[in-house]
Amino acid sequence: IYTATFTAQWKESVNAAGLTVHTPVAGTGVFAGNSYEARAALDGETVSSAEFQAAAGQVIPDGDMESGSLPCFGKSTSESTTFWGSGNAATSGLCAQSTKPGMGGSYCAKLESQSAFGLLAAGNLFSATFRFASLSGTASFGMPYQWTARPTALRLKYHATVGAVNKGTVPEEHEYIQDGQDRSRIFAVIVDWNSRHATVAGMGSPTGVWDPAKTAETAEGPVIAYGSLLIGETTPGDAMTTVEIPIEYYDRTTKPTGAYTLVISCTTSAYGDFKVGCLGNVMYVDDFEWVY
């Protein structure tokens, strides 16, 4: 009896923050949901072949945005969410169920920046709980997720309207703002955390701000992989478009076992925690799914 092991090959590179990351090489390894053909050859001649289907990948909970009862769409309903939340509290229009040409199904999510107490409140949608008290909002990032396969990308539909910064003072570290142009952002992160990571934003300076493209570990535990999309211009036309955001791995081998293992975040302004961005930015998102 002969056996064979199929393992992915990885391409190593350095990201913009100078950190080493890895991406799987297409055509190597076995990935969820894909079909494969295996052949046995002797002296260059195929003597046996077989096809097999890898087990299906995982579903992102309510990634189709079809349920109007999701906590992210309500006002002050994200404090105990089990997956999708938003900053809807002092203002209720940061995340709403909506419709848009090109969406999948009957509904999508609409994120829209608002003015709250004279400051920018970026439209947002995230896998986090959210609590608003004493004029401050606390987003606690991280949801339990039982990983069974490594994704190569996050696929979704989106449409963004992005303008120039017109609210707030640009922070010192502002590489995501170029020539005064705001940027929206979508990211997905595989983490191995023992607790949620809290980011607090209010009338003063934010605390707990983090960027998965700049760190492979937080106080809560390792950041295993991330995918990030910065959107610096308005999407052409009126219809949503499909995008695949590649996942880059800091750690190629560890399977997350922590209490909190997934973060997805969408915001109309990359520096929304600092109350900096364009009042007028709008982003529609729908049909979140993994690519393997």
PLM features: what roles do these ranges have?
Residues 37-41, 263-265:
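Extracellular recognition modules
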Residues 49-88:
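Extracellular carbohydrate-recognition regions
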Residues 99-120, 124:
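Short carbohydrate-recognition loop motifs
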Residues 146-155, 160, 164-166, 181, ...:
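Extended extracellular/luminal ectodomain segments enriched in beta-structured repeat modules
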